């Protein structure tokens, strides 16, 4: 082998090695990742379906306050809140009738504050940073790099959080579907994404993902892509606003280097 050929081959190998080692950096620079709010606001939403039109401030909802106490299933299956904000026809009248937030075990005036006038501003304040001083209560939980900067999965596995799986509608049985999916990347040089069902079925009901988000029967998953995820589809329904964001590449692509 000539010196020139050997040098070219070495340069190529070096480039590939550097490319692999810098994958997370390239990913965050290549993809148009949305800017992240402060850790104490990540997952906070404003419920404003009808509030402004009625001269009322939008209601603030903090996922990190609630997810310590309840699994996703409680709100998004049992209480029938849609996965997308401001698409559930929640009303104050319904709350007072014991539906949605007013369900027994939630904001019923017993388990937590109810719907009397002195309590109104605890929700209807229009401020995503409301009660951010409580975020320090989470300082003992395992750290993560993005989102709330809390590794909620580790916190759950270590018993540092013990969210309730139900209020009154108990799951028929523990969902034992544990299959782990390996999703090959559409980009050369990027390692596959790993999807473990078990951590998701512990927090969610199967119907939270299937068939609306992932319709396996109709083969809509053939349109699954990183671009679709970043657009709020598929994994992006959760992993863009509440669950750890897609900036945290290695959480899904574990073979990536730090």
Annotated model-derived regions:
Residues 2-13:
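Bacterial N-terminal signal peptides that target proteins for export
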Residues 12-22:
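Bacterial N-terminal signal peptides
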Residues 5-6, 20, 29, 197:
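Intrinsic disorder/low-complexity signature
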Residues 26-258:
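Short sequence/structural segments immediately N-terminal
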């Amino acid at each position: 082998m000539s010196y020139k050929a050997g040098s070219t081959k070495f340069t190529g190998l070096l480039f590939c090695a550097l490319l692999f080692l810098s994958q997370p950096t390239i990913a965050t620079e290549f993809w148009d990742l949305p800017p992240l709010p402060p850790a104490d606001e990540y997952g906070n939403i404003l419920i404003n379906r009808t509030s402004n039109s009625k001269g009322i401030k939008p209601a603030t909802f903090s996922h990190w306050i609630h997810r310590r106490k309840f699994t996703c299933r409680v709100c998004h299956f049992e209480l029938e809140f849609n996965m997308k904000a401001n698409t559930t026809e929640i009303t104050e009248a319904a709350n007072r009738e014991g539906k949605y937030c007013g369900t027994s075990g939630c904001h019923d005036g017993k388990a937590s504050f109810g719907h009397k006038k002195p309590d109104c501003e605890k929700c209807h304040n229009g401020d995503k940073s409301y009660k951010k001083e409580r975020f320090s209560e989470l300082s003992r939980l395992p750290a993560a790099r993005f989102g709330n900067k809390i590794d909620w999965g580790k916190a759950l596995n270590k018993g540092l959080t013990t969210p309730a799986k139900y209020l009154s509608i108990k799951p028929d049985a523990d969902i034992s579907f544990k299959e782990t999916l390996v999703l090959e990347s559409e980009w050369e040089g990027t390692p596959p994404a790993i999807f473990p069902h078990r951590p998701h079925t512990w927090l969610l009901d199967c119907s939270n993902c299937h068939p609306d988000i992932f319709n396996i029967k109709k083969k809509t998953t053939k349109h699954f892509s990183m671009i679709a995820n970043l657009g709020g589809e598929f994994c992006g329904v959760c992993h863009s606003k509440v669950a750890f964001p897609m900036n945290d590449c290695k959480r899904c692509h574990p073979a990536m280097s730090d």
